[in-house]
Each structure stands twice: as C-alpha cells, then as structure tokens.
C-alpha cells in the first residue's frame, strides 16, 4: 500500500518537482507558477518535491536556491518539500513487488555487451535499443546469470499496442510500444532511476495533473506504462513548450539572468516577475497587467499556447517599471536601501528615503535604477570641472546669487521654490534650462535630476544654500 491516504473524492493535486542540480531558472519558475495556479484555481493542493536521487550533481546549495526562489515568488506549497533520497525504502518496496509480479526482471548485461548490441543494430540500420535478451518470455530459455555480477532491474514494457494520452496543452500524443525498450528502473547498486521514482511519487502523492516542460514528453509513455502495471490511476498531463530567448534560440545563460534570484538581486519585484511569467505562453484576452489573485481566478490550461514562448527582457523591465510606479513608497525605500548602501550613500544624512522614492520612481525600471536615481540625495558632491565650466558661467553667476538670496527666506516647499525660480528668470531674462542646469550641477553634482524644485525641497534649505554659496 502507498503511504499516503487516498480520499474517496480526490481533489486536484499538482506538483513541482525540480532536481537540485542548479538554480531555479525561468523555465522552472514558470512550471512552478502554472502548477501552483492550477491547484489554487480549483481549490486543490500544490506539492513541492525535490528530486535529488542524482547524488553526484545534487547540492544543498541548489536545494536552498530553489526554496529561496519559491519563497521570493510566494509560491507556497501545501505539502512538502518531499525529498526522494528520504523515500528510497519506498522505491525498493515497489521494485520488489514488480519483480514478484513479473512486471520487472533482472538484467545482467554489462556495459560492453550493451555497447556491442547497439553497434550491431546500427550496422544493420536499426534503431539502437535493448534487445530483451534477459526478458522472461513463455518458452524462452534465459542465459545463466554470471557469477559476481549485480544486475539492473528493467521494467517489462508492453511490446504491442500503443500508449496514448490527451495532453492538456498539445492534444493527443501517441507512441507505439514497440518503440519503447525495457527501461532500467533500478541500477546495479540498487538505486532507483529517475523515471521510476517519478512514477511512484506521483502515485503515492495522488497527483492528478502533471504540468511540466515538453522535454518530458518522451518520458511520459514509459511512466504511463509503469503506472498501469502498478494498477495506479494515470494523472492528466500538460506539457509546456520551451521558452526562447530574445533572439529566438533556446533560453540559456547567454540571454541574461540564470536564476530567478538574480532578478531579485537586480531589483525586480516578485509580483512583476509573476505577471511576466504568467504571460509566457498563456494569455487572458489582451490583459497585460494583473495581480496574482486575478491570475489565479483566470488561469486555465485551455489558453496555454502549444508553441514556444519568447522571453523579452525589455518587456519584463517595462512591467517591472509599472509595478514600481504603483508600489508603496515605504516598501520601495526598504528595498532600495541595500542598493544605496552599496552605492556608498550615507542614509543618515539626507531626506526621508520614502519621499525620495516617490519622487524618482516614475522612470525606474528596477529597484537598482531607483537606488541609482536616489543616490544623489545621500552623497558627498563631486561635480566635475567639465560640468562646472560648461554650466556655471560668468553670465549665469549673478542669477545664481539672486536665486540664493530668494531661497533664504521663503517657505521651504516646492511651490515657493518654483516661484523663486520664475522670479529670478524674469529678473535676469533667462530661460529655465540656463538657470536650472547650473543649480543641478552645484547642488547635486549631476546634470540630470528629477524636477529641480522637488529636488531642492527634499535636499533641504541648509544643504542647498551651502552648496550654492560655496560655488559663488
């Protein structure tokens, strides 16, 4: 019996089952999101399973990176994480049952024998495959097991008929059983193989819908046949097409971020990444901006496109910018703080960071860009000699001195500062850029800032006047 209880009326149960051999990448995150959203939409359950039987390549760091990525995206699971390495007893139990029932058998072929077998098949123009020499058949005499050789265990795959399923994304997919050889389900050292563990886990965990990348399509007929041999209910399958990079080739490291957490490090908001991932191969009419609650309400498998989705970094940046513009300023301040500190900003000596974020966030595509725009409010000035020579000319110095005098006594708020600029411009016959640019350079060290009146308001009267007078 499987160790998980089985309700009489099973609810929808999905799973995300990453292998911890690397970081949580964009494709994996989309699979997790769609599996999570499908379960949430139907009031079902979402299971997290870590497929860590590849001991040589699985690392604790990769497991933590996956958990961190899931937590950042807030893809909460109802059960798990389950680790396959903690379920080896269960796989061994099922293998013994299959050996006893005749659904599996021992194979003593050496690596050299298998290589020779494949070479001979290629020479005859045949598809390389296991020839079934250790497969028990009625009336067949098997070779004598060689002494001192530990056998593998192979699944006795049906040899006739077809295995087919109605894929919820790609439509009906069918394989001839004659094309499928007898899969190894346990290695010579007794460890179970990937395809077998997946089957037992999906069975035990009562998974009703398997949503995964289409690189698993070729695994599916083998897994279905094993499930049928076990007398297990076969789940529904939905295979998602691959994600292409901006240039139309398969998404890879050279297209930018390798892991989901790299987007966190670059200053993307998780809700923007969720929104973008949702639109990678799925749509709801023309809707582009929507929160996770709306996504869960809308999500279905019928509107997933069977063709490849194309990742567009600029579109993600645009989406992130929309979310930053709408975000709470206090939250943005907390997110921007580490970036500002990295920029060498002294946050104790400057205006309220939330107020600064409110001023500069309109044009910020990332939190990193937001922090870069805010840095000028929290650092020691170093305008370059070139900027000073270009903008602080003898012609404009009288107007700068006049402006400083007007700024000394007015009420320090944006409207009054703007009025002081207009009065100074009128008195000296200047256009706004002629006065605003040198003020920017002298007060912030930068030729480009947010609106000059708002910038001066946040910097404060004392700091503004000290910097103007120091130059005059």
UniProtKB/Swiss-Prot annotation:
Molecular function, one GO term: ATP binding
GO CC, alphabetical: cytosol
InterPro entries according to UniProt: aa-tRNA-synth_I_cd-bd (IPR045462), aa-tRNA-synth_I_codon-bd_sub2 (IPR020751), aa-tRNA-synth_I_CS (IPR001412), aa_tRNA-synth_I_cd-bd_sf (IPR008925), Glu-tRNA-ligase_bac/mito (IPR004527), Glu/Gln-tRNA-synth (IPR000924), Glu/Gln-tRNA-synth_Ib_cat-dom (IPR020058), GluQ/Sye (IPR049940)
PROSITE patterns xref list: AA_TRNA_LIGASE_I
One Pfam assignment: tRNA-synt_1c
Record bears the keyword Lipid metabolism: no
Gene3D superfamilies, per the entry: 1.10.10.350, HUPs
Catalytic activity: tRNA(Glu) + L-glutamate + ATP = L-glutamyl-tRNA(Glu) + AMP + diphosphate
Binding-site list for ATP: 253
CDD domains hit by this protein: GluRS_core
SUPFAM superfamilies xrefs: An anticodon-binding domain of class I aminoacyl-tRNA synthetases, Nucleotidylyl transferase
Residue ranges, compositional bias (Basic and acidic residues): 122-138
Enzyme class label: ligase
Motif ('HIGH' region): 18-28
GO BP term, example: glutamyl-tRNA aminoacylation
Keyword list, A-Z: Aminoacyl-tRNA synthetase, ATP-binding, Cytoplasm, Ligase, Nucleotide-binding, Protein biosynthesis
Family matches, as NCBIfam families: gltX_bact
Summary of the function given for this chain in its UniProt record: Catalyzes the attachment of glutamate to tRNA(Glu) in a two-step reaction: glutamate is first activated by ATP to form Glu-AMP and then transferred to the acceptor end of tRNA(Glu).
PANTHER family given in the database record: GLUTAMATE--TRNA LIGASE, GLUTAMATE--TRNA LIGASE, MITOCHONDRIAL-RELATED
Subunit note: Monomer.
Family: Belongs to the class-I aminoacyl-tRNA synthetase family. Glutamate--tRNA ligase type 1 subfamily.
Entry protein name: Glutamate--tRNA ligase
Organism the protein comes from: Thiobacillus denitrificans (strain ATCC 25259 / T1)
Native organism taxonomy: Bacteria, Pseudomonadati, Pseudomonadota, Betaproteobacteria, Nitrosomonadales
């Amino acid at each position: 019996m499987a160790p998980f209880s089985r309700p009489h009326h099973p609810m929808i149960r999905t799973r995300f089952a990453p292998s911890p051999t690397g970081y949580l990448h964009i494709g994996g995150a989309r699979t997790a999101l769609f599996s999570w959203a499908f379960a949430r939409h139907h009031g079902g359950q979402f299971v997290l399973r870590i497929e860590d039987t590849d001991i040589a390549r699985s690392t604790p760091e990769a497991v933590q990176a996956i958990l961190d990525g899931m937590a950042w995206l807030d893809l909460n699971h109802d059960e798990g994480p389950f680790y396959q390495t903690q379920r080896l007893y269960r796989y061994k139990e099922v293998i013994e049952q299959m050996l006893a029932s005749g659904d599996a058998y021992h194979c003593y072929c050496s690596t050299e024998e298998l290589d020779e077998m494949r070479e001979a098949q290629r020479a005859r123009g045949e598809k390389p495959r296991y020839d079934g020499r250790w497969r028990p058949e009625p009336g067949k005499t098997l070779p004598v097991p060689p002494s001192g050789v530990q056998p593998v265990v192979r699944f006795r795959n049906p040899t006739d008929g077809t295995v087919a399923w109605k894929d919820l994304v790609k439509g009906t997919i069918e394989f001839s059983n004659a094309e499928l050889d007898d899969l190894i389900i346990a290695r010579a050292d007794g460890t179970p193989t990937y395809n077998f563990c997946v089957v037992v886990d999906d069975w035990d965990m009562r998974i009703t819908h398997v949503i995964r990348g289409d690189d698993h399509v070729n695994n599916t007929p083998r897994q279905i046949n094993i499930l049928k041999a076990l007398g297990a209910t076969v789940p529904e399958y939905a295979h998602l097409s691959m994600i292409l990079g901006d240039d139309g080739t398969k998404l890879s490291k050279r297209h930018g971020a390798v892991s989901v957490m790299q987007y966190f490090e670059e200053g993307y908001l998780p809700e923007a990444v969720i929104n973008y991932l949702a639109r990678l191969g799925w749509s709801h009419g023309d809707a582009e901006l929507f929160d996770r609650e709306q996504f869960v309400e809308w999500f279905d498998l019928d509107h997933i496109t069977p063709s490849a989705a194309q990742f567009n970094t600029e579109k993600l940046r645009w989406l992130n910018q929309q979310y930053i513009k709408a975000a709470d300023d206090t939250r943005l301040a907390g997110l921007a703080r580490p970036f500002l500190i990295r920029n060498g900003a002294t946050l104790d000596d400057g205006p309220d960071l939330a107020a600064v974020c409110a001023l500069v966030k309109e044009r910020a595509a990332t939190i990193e860009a937001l922090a870069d725009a805010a840095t000028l409010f929290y650092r020691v000035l170093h305008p370059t000699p070139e900027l000073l020579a270009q903008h602080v000319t003898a012609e404009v110095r009288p107007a700068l001195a006049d402006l400083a005098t007007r700024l000394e006594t007015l009420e320090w708020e944006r409207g009054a500062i703007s009025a002081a600029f207009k009065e100074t411009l009128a008195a000296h016959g200047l256009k706004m850029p002629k006065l605003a640019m040198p003020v920017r350079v002298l007060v912030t060290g930068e030729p480009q800032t947010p609106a000059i009146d708002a910038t001066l308001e946040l910097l404060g009267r004392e700091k503004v006047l000290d910097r103007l007078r120091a130059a005059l």
